[in-house]
């Protein structure tokens, strides 16, 4: 099981260079398992025991397995994650021609570690909107090949480089795509038109707009002397998306189960398809009776917010509280913050720990050092919108928000096992 899950994760990461592609990958796997699409613009008539999914903006998805009995009896089991990761996004008018090189201007998306983006073989993917035969349409594209790079400045020209330096995103992050003659002018949208023709065999009249991200072309891989680790891009938080999907597909219970994977978590979640938007609430309102029954059902429900945790780094162990240093390959982490940066409370943490113990899955705890600030997740946002009890958990990771992150190769199986047990659980606290 562990090897198959790790292989599947690596394939999922490769197919998901952007939130749009991650959502498409999730859709493909859900449809293969018999899930049917619900269009938000249509009237819904879901069947008891039916399996459905809803997408919004092509970058967020909610999968629903309706139970054979009313969710009012035993509530809804929900797992939440997010599809986006920090990256470099292409600007609307990106063409830069400097010193005989074609470069593209980029905007930093989210809280990215910038230094690792230098000297990497980069490709470009995302969504392109165009006009064809008088109609406005959109398609996903992925160049796949390494078409760009951000070369470092040689140490001979920057003698203090190893002492740390502030990276200027405006001046230092535009990737190089090609050499060009002095009088040659490159139209980036024309390049996108060519890519649409190559990838989809369609001829666009004009490219109207796009949402494109650079990404590292190096595939995720099992690494380490004993294969103890998985290294790859976008583990935060496609690792949790994949774990939630595998658990949902494996759960054969009669309970109502939901997997929600939102976009825009890395930039605050405040969007129509983000956790701070109405997508999940609106979806549940259309599936559940209004008023009293809706509120009662949510009060019987529970959300597991799954987002990677900071593993204790052997070179920087003092960055963790001495009693709360999660270790790689030692199981999922219950994340606690008394200032509500995480939504965990004693009841939800106790229930998750109970599930882990019952499944013989190791479990850990994380609390940030008292002299450091704490990040957050979709957990508190979802809890405050729905009033649903929530526990924040995640798998330990190194190099979070780097272009290449690291997790334990045993932990995915641990998380899938306990999330499957959660979906199958007959009673919630």
Curated annotation (Swiss-Prot):
Gene3D superfamilies in UniProt: Aminopeptidase i, Domain 2 (2.30.250.10), Zn peptidases (3.40.630.10)
Residue sites binding Zn(2+) per the record: 82, 156, 401
CDD domains associated with the record: M18_DAP (cd05658)
Keywords assigned: Aminopeptidase, Hydrolase, Metal-binding, Metalloprotease, Protease, Zinc
InterPro entries registered for this protein in UniProt: M18_aminopeptidase_2 (IPR022984), Peptidase_M18 (IPR001948), Peptidase_M18_dom2 (IPR023358)
Sample GO molecular function, one term: zinc ion binding
Annotated organism of origin: Pseudomonas putida (strain ATCC 700007 / DSM 6899 / JCM 31910 / BCRC 17059 / LMG 24140 / F1)
NCBIfam families in alphabetical order: PRK02813.1
EC number: 3.4.11.-
Gene Ontology terms: biological process: proteolysis
One GO cellular component, as annotated: cytoplasm
Record-stated family: Belongs to the peptidase M18 family.
EC class: hydrolase
Protein name: Probable M18 family aminopeptidase 2
Cofactor dependency: Zn(2+)
